[in-house]
C-alpha cells in the first residue's frame, strides 16, 4: 500500500453551494472539480446533501480512472465574518467518498478564523 497514489479533496461547503476540488498532494495541479450547479439545475438544490453525494460519486469515478485510491480531505466553511460551520453538503460528500471505495486519510477543518478582523454586519444591539 506504500505505492498507493493520494490526492487532496478540498470541500467548500456553505448554505448556498458546495464546491469540491481534488488536487494532487502539493495542491498545485487540479485533478478534478465539481460544484452544485454542475449536478442540479435548481439553485435551491446546490447545497443539498443529495447533490454533494452525486458530486462525490462522480469525482470518485474520475479519481479511480486516474489511478488515485486515497484522499485527504480539507473541509472549509465560509468563515471570516460569516458562518464558521460547514453547510449540509460537507458530511454527505465525505460519506459518499468512503462508500465509493476511496480510502480516506486525514480530515481537517481549514475554515478561515479571523484574529479580531472586520466589524460584523448588522446593527448595534444594546
Curated annotation (Swiss-Prot):
Top-level taxonomic group: Archaea
UniProt GO MF annotations: rRNA binding; structural constituent of ribosome
Assembly and oligomerization: Part of the 30S ribosomal subunit.
Protein's organism: Methanosarcina barkeri (strain Fusaro / DSM 804)
Protein name as it appears in the record: Small ribosomal subunit protein uS11
GO cellular component: ribonucleoprotein complex; ribosome
Sequence similarity: Belongs to the universal ribosomal protein uS11 family.
GO BP: any one term: translation
InterPro entries linked: Ribosomal_uS11, Ribosomal_uS11_archaeal, Ribosomal_uS11_CS, Ribosomal_uS11_sf
UniProt KW keywords: Ribonucleoprotein, Ribosomal protein, RNA-binding, rRNA-binding
Role noted for this protein: Located on the platform of the 30S subunit.
A Pfam family reported for this protein in Swiss-Prot or TrEMBL: Ribosomal_S11
